[in-house]
Amino acid sequence: MSEPQQQPVVKRADDITYESVDAADGMRKGVLLDESDGAPNFAIRRFVLEPGASVPKHTNAVEHEQYVLEGEYIVGIDGEEYTVSAGDSLLIPADVVHWYRNEGDEQGAFICGVPNGDDEILLAE
């Protein structure tokens, strides 16, 4: 007997709910696709950093692949700070301290892909 075939999913922008991120001032997250949509391996999320947003130093148990959609903001990774803008890509390995800060007047936004499953987030400060 063959395995059931995975079904395609098209999720519209209007179907995405954004929620504030705990411990992050001025950041919102919308889950674009994950296990609940039938994606077996990865979740993709869209994060918005409002002007003045600040996300404290923290680690995640899973890697993050990110693509900057809009704006310009600062990402700290393992002790170094980078100013990123639309079109930039980032790899943040698992268990590496990182943080975000939007010092500009415009919102920033990025796509973040992570493996499905549990992710333990630990504040570093």
Positions of the model-derived regions?
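Short acidic-glycine-tyrosine-enriched beta hairpin
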Residues: G79-D95
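A short, N-terminal "cap"/entry segment at the start of jelly-roll beta-barrel domains
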Residues: M1-N41, A124-E125
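Short histidine-centered beta-strand/loop micro-motifs
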Residues: L33, V55-N60, R101-E103, L123
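Conserved short histidine dyad/triad with adjacent acidic residue
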Residues: K29-G30, R45-N60, A94
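Short, conserved beta-strand element in jelly-roll/cupin
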Residues: R46-E50, N60-I77, G113
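Ligand-binding loop in jelly-roll beta-barrel domains
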Residues: A94-E120
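Anionic, Ser/Thr-rich low-complexity intrinsically disordered regions
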Residues: L33, I44, F110-I111
